[in-house]
Amino acid sequence: VERIRDPKIECMSRDEMAALQSERLVDVVKRVYDNVPFYRKKMQQRGVEPGDIKSIDDIGKLPFTTKEDLRDNYPFGLLAIPKKDVARVQGTSGTTGKLTIAPYSQKDVDVWGECVARGLTMAGLTDEDIIHVCYGYGLFTGGLGLDYGAKALGAMAIPMSAGNTKRQMMCMEDLGATAFACTPSYALYLAESIQEAGLVDHMKLKAGIHGAEPWTEEMRKKIESILHINCFDIYGLCEITGPGVAQDCIHKAGLHVHADYFYPEVLNPATHEACADGETGELVFTTLAKEAMPLIRYRTKDLTSIDHSTCECGRTLPRISKFTGRTDDMKVIRGVNVFPTQVETALLSMGGVIAPHYMMIVDREDNLDVLTVMVEVDESVFSDEIRKLDALRNKIAGVLKTALGVSVRVKLVEPKSIQRSEGKAVRVIDNRNL
């Protein structure tokens, strides 16, 4: 029998869910209008008042919010509660090197844990499980999100954080982990490392919870077949609540969105009209109960489709498909958002023999993302001794690692060797077959 953490909500009829969403939308719109000058101004520009929003069907009258709006109002411009009521902030890298900050009230943190716990329940986990978390802990939402979820579930969490694969394997084996959570690329690397060490039969694993970067069904099947487990796709974004916005169940027929807290729309990116079920468009979220930084119609730039039919598991929550891409050129590398503009800014800041002509190449090696940046440098550089070339390469790699938050391989090339484009420059070659 499929375990459902909150059947009242997760199996609610569409009419009941719409009534709950309507009640929450009316409340959140009034709150942002009264407390967030940014939203008040945006709504006034559209000639919309809180009284015009009577139900969830009126959501199309409201303005969009974008990542740029978050950046322009950094750090606390979109706060809807007094700063003293903020329990914590989480963050993610932005295009300008400034973080995208997401403040949380204590209730927001509790809701976050509850949503992740619903997902862990979809993965068949209970308070008897031991969940090994190898997502990074810190401003990045991965580690803490899974930790809060394990706590809400009553399970034991092992807060390993990222890196040191041998130690990860030792802890998983010695502590008897029954589930592990990390990016899919690291999950595959870890699975193969466990296999090579002959430890598959020593493990008690039954589930993997993986997200923070796009991955294919082929990759899922590979991890599952090596470790003899079920792997689940978890989705979230720091601005909305980190992991736990949506997750798939054992039927793996789309990710269930916790639509009582996060109202999903899938819209045609050009016309902003709603897409029919099954039609691909941009995913847009409205947070229905967030206290600290509610977001209205936040454009995620993730491309997906939506399905409102009831799942075989009995849940009526809408399901979104695996992501087919993004509407912009951002790349997710080892769970970190990397923008070509960040590379450009970093190279320009160095000046000297370095030209702002570059190419980012993303590969998968041993199932881990590897970012190589080709950088054009002055011809004179190549007449220098090898030691000087290595020093320059290391210097650029250091600057890029600081700017991007991921380590980078740097390849120095001669001027004009990177192809120029007439139109929009091709800055990224992604060989990962995602």
Regions picked out by a protein language model, each given a short descriptive name:
Residues 1-91, 96-114, 118-122, 203, ...:
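Nucleotide 5′-phosphate-binding alpha/beta core
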Residues 1-8, 65-232, 240, 244-250, ...:
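Active-site phosphate/ATP/adenylate-binding loop shared across adenylate-forming ligases
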Residues 9, 256, 322-326:
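Short, flexible turn/loop "capping" segments at secondary-structure junctions
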Residues 38, 48, 125, 199, ...:
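Helix N-cap/coil-helix junction residues
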Residues 160, 234, 267, 363, ...:
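Conserved beta-strand termini and adjacent loop/short-helix elements that scaffold enzyme active sites
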Residues 180, 289-404, 423:
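AMP-binding/adenylate-forming catalytic core of the ANL superfamily
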Residues 203, 258-261, 326:
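Short, solvent-exposed loop/turn segments at the edges of secondary structure
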Residues 215-310:
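Conserved AMP-binding/adenylate-forming
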